[in-house]
């Protein structure tokens, strides 16, 4: 009873992918499932998203895990390979590689592979993280074209740095740069992430790379209203994080609650202790007033988040009982709201769920 639970609705996951495909019928979906499926479980998510045209992961270990459990779909590794041993694994397990630096090109040229490799040339149009500059990219593309180790055509991709910003100036510049540099290149193209998927229909090219939206979460947080109604109407949250009330206490006016005595009762009042804390991945920096959902009603967090427990104000829930479920985020309480309160992003909260949280799959 004491363990927090992350309930993963695989039906919602499948539904979200179907919505993405319906909104971009001319594009293929490259489902991003890196970082343990955004905290939802790598293998679980891959099996649920069998209708995706390909999967995107961050590193070779994630890709090999999928192959080991029998996932046969195309897998593209976003950071590519870094030595000959890894490169051989790419060929052996039919993994696609993102090529983003000259060291990788050199490795391809000097390594004898058992089979040719599917690759994507990453063009840095302004993210300034990985990829070849706009000026370098044509020469690298021509160099890759001559390699017998590479399948043709070569994929062409970029990554948008600011697609979730209502000011579109920089993203439009990135898209313009990409179309310009790839104009004479032959190969499938990929530009958009989840935010770009909604905000830049002109960039819905051959492949789209949905990530956070697959899990029913807005890439815009709670402050960007242009797509709020569409996202809430068409997409469903996949993860619901919950924990149980393990104690109810009646506290007196001026009693402090929790470490540091940072919060005090304004009157005599009931409080509940809930079996979740930062040791489970709930954000320690969530302030008093952060909402939780109890029996369909909002209750505020009070005091500091502890490693194993939080306290909540029960004044709106006088009939609450030990054993009642408290929803920390998910169905009925968007994780974007909790992220905003905690001064972070939903991605971080999802990826920080720890191993002691029990995961349950449902189809609903």
UniProtKB/Swiss-Prot annotation:
The keyword Isomerase applies. Keywords: Isomerase, Pyridoxal phosphate. InterPro entries: Ala_racemase, Ala_racemase/Decarboxylase_C, Ala_racemase_C, Ala_racemase_N, PLP-binding_barrel. CDD domains: PLPDE_III_AR_proteobact. The active site is at residues 34, 259. Pfam families: Ala_racemase_C, Ala_racemase_N. Its EC number is 5.1.1.1. One of its GO terms (molecular function) is alanine racemase activity. It comes from the Bacteria. Its cofactor is pyridoxal 5'-phosphate. Signal peptide: none annotated. It catalyses: L-alanine = D-alanine. Belongs to the alanine racemase family. Catalyzes the interconversion of L-alanine and D-alanine. May also act on other amino acids. This is Alanine racemase. It comes from Coxiella burnetii (strain RSA 331 / Henzerling II).
